[in-house]
Amino acid sequence: MDINFSQNEARVIGCLLEKEVTTPDQYPLTLNALTTACNQKSNREPVMALDEATVLDTVELLKEKRLINDVSSFGSRVSKFQHRFCNTEFGSLKFTSQEFAAVCVMLLRGPQSAGEIRTRTNRLCTFSDVKEVEAMLDGLAEHAKGPYVVKLPRESGKRDCRYMHLFSGEVDVEALAAAVKSTSTAGLASANNERFAELEEDMKAMKLEIAELKELLESLTS
């Protein structure tokens, strides 16, 4: 895949995808509106604090890659921007509404479980259940022109695996799996060490109690 977004580029594209659906009356977005969207505290991970100059620099980079258009009318003093990332006449990347929503959320929030995607896309599309989300994600992972997403190793203490988009480069799943295993082993060792320390303290307390009982018995029998 030719696309390899930086963190700022992923945020800008994700915001344009989101606002195209959730606030169509305000789309395409002005620079001010796009900056506000990038810095939202809800549905963003991480929360960012980009200034307009940084957002504009990012927009210019995406324009060079032909992934954003300035659609302001002739003579207008305010620029307005729309994406050319997918589902447009300018490119071959086509997604269903569910695929569009899932990619949008992953661009804005990073790795997500199927359950999280179902919950966090409710303003963008509908899923009947988590299995439908998983089937859609598997389709993106096995897409003939992709893959567009990858299933990540399940983290220690987590019930579900998460999925990550591949529009910011390949993900080394084997390295992640090794890191997860190492973290899990380290966590277990740490827990064992803590338990051993607790047992040592219990033993010391018991020895002290026994010594006190001996002293009490000796005083009673003397």
From Swiss-Prot:
Pfam family, one: DUF480
Disulfide links within the chain: none
InterPro entries listed in its UniProt record: DUF480 (IPR007432), WH-like_DNA-bd_sf (IPR036388), WH_DNA-bd_sf (IPR036390)
Family: Belongs to the UPF0502 family.
Name of this protein: UPF0502 protein PBPRB0676
Source organism phylogeny: Bacteria, Pseudomonadati, Pseudomonadota, Gammaproteobacteria, Vibrionales
